[in-house]
Amino acid sequence: MVVERLQTNLGQQLELLESLKTVVAQEQQLLCSGRIQGIVLQGVTEQKSSILATLAYLDQTRLTTEKNINIQAPYSNVPALAERWQRILELAEGLRYSNLHNGLLLQQHIEHNTQALAVLNTRHGQSLYGPDGHAKGASLLGRKIGI
């Protein structure tokens, strides 16, 4: 019975890793598109965080179950568990590389935006926006106009 519970746990982790693979692929598509849609990217990031939190919980449950029945991954004595564990390791490794790639793409976008802001700030001598995030008034012929 306890081995069945462990098998179910590993199955749930596999399902979540497959879902995470889909979410990471969506994130990569967004990061590779010409212009990032912040709200959409935020939603994908929240999905990713939720899946990772659930995976962390399931993994902690797995470790507790292993301790209780004195068994440990890679489960070489239980073929059904060993097969699932191997698949988990393969998916996790692929996700690690995909996530690293997405991180590099995101870093490129951040650097591009930082450079663009630096150009804007040097050309105009000062920030286009005030501390409140609203556009500063522009002066034309000695008069201040608010936009």
UniProtKB/Swiss-Prot annotation:
It is found in: Cytoplasm. Keywords: Bacterial flagellum biogenesis, Cytoplasm. Gene3D superfamilies: FlgN-like. The keyword Translocase does not apply. GO terms for cellular component: cytoplasm. One of its GO terms (biological process) is bacterial-type flagellum assembly. Its main location: cytoplasm. It comes from the Bacteria. The keyword Plastid does not apply. Required for the efficient initiation of filament assembly. Belongs to the FlgN family. This is Flagella synthesis protein FlgN. The gene is flgN.
